[in-house]
Amino acid sequence: MIDFWCCVYASILDKNLFLKRIRFYSLLRVIVRLGGNIVLPLYFQLTAKNNSYRLSAFSKEQGRIIVTVTSFPKRIGRLWLTLESILRQKIKPDMIIVWLSKEQFPTEESIPFKLRQLRSRGIIIRLEEYDFASHKKYYYVLRDYREDHFITIDDDIIYPSDFIFSLVNGYKQNPNCVVSRYAFEMKYDLNGNLLPYMTWSMVRKEMEQTDVAFLGTGGGALFPAHSLYPDVSNIELALSLCKYADDVWLNAMLRLNGKKVVVVDNLFSIFPILYLKDFSLSSLNCHQNMNDVQIKAVRKYYEENIGQDPFAKI
């Protein structure tokens, strides 16, 4: 059921220029998105008692696969849809952790009931003191589970059933790399200068070990244990340089640590959750050129402090 909607949504491509100009494809995407956002929640509720849609008790103490996600009040009400899609994977992670801030969710009762119900099926919900925005998704898992591998997801996406399998399989074949399902190819001019973010092209096919892929954490990325530069846990520095772009920070950290990125299959088969009043960091970063501003800040800091540009052409 999930894969059907993901495939239908992914199949809508802007092939005809005229139809693109009259926004036919945009309208079609809206219709499909509305349909899926009606059908899938009903499907999830009707099948929630299936014993295969839960996590088993884990026995390993390190080397686990942990799916990590965060959310905020405007989206928390539908986060359960994202988590249902993760519970229905072909291969399941060892742990799924939701990191929330007490600044936004001061009590257990402030967490939606549907989300709290998922604890009985293995979901872990952690209330932490401070709100580090989207940086919560990696900061706390690195603090508490440093010897484990983690997969980042977003709270506004329903993931296809092969999502975790493709990332884990990519990691097994490339154990020294970070693995992603969604990335952009960074562009440089003839002199090796990094071009603006809006000129980068989306990666539409698999890429073997590469230095030019800028991964997106929301589309799904697997970070092996110890794959990131030690500064990754310096949350004050991260927030001062790129508060609204955990993607920028994590890409810088993997590059400073000498890691390459592998982009695996099926990059577009995700299904967006519909929110009536949505706020997207990706929209803010793209439309206001904030990605360029934050990338520039990160480059400047590391050039001045360690003499290395994390986004230099290699």
Residue ranges and their predicted role:
Residues 82-94, 117:
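Short, acidic, metal-binding catalytic loop of nucleotide-sugar glycosyltransferases
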Residues 94-95, 149, 260:
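Residues at the starts of beta-strands that form the adenosine-phosphate
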Residues 2-46, 237-314:
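C-terminal catalytic/acceptor-binding lobe
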Residues 69-81, 91:
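Active-site beta-to-alpha loop of glycosyltransferases that engages the nucleotide-sugar donor
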Residues 63-69, 86, 94-100, 247:
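Hydrophobic targeting segments
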Residues 101-147:
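Active-site-proximal specificity loops/subdomain of glycosyltransferases
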Residues 141, 160-236:
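Conserved catalytic core of nucleotide-sugar-dependent glycosyltransferases
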Residues 148-158:
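Short beta-strand-to-loop acidic/aromatic patch adjacent to the donor-nucleotide binding site
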